[in-house]
């Protein structure tokens, strides 16, 4: 292995769909448990503390499969793709 070259890692084309599916599952789980889903997800994304996400429905394990920056990137892309650029 050549240590002089930077290796490029690509999350793949399925990653955004997986992030979306994960966020939908986590959101629904948080609602089911009586939490404010937006506040809890934002708390997790800002702090990295998985305690913001319940273990119920395997939501905590699902969201931790994605890097927080990957989730934020998907949220921003989705927001801008919806025409929210004004």
Swiss-Prot record:
Belongs to the UPF0297 family. This is UPF0297 protein LCA_0388. The lineage of its organism: Bacteria, Bacillati, Bacillota, Bacilli, Lactobacillales.
């Amino acid at each position: 292995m050549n240590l002089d070259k930077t290796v490029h890692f690509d999350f793949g084309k399925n990653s955004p769909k997986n992030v979306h599916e994960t966020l939908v599952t986590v959101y629904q789980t948080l609602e089911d448990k009586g939490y404010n889903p937006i506040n809890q997800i934002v708390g997790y994304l800002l702090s990295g503390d998985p305690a913001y996400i319940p273990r119920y429905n395997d939501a905590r394990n699902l969201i931790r499969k994605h890097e927080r920056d990957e989730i934020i990137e998907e949220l921003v892309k989705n927001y801008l793709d919806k025409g929210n650029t004004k």
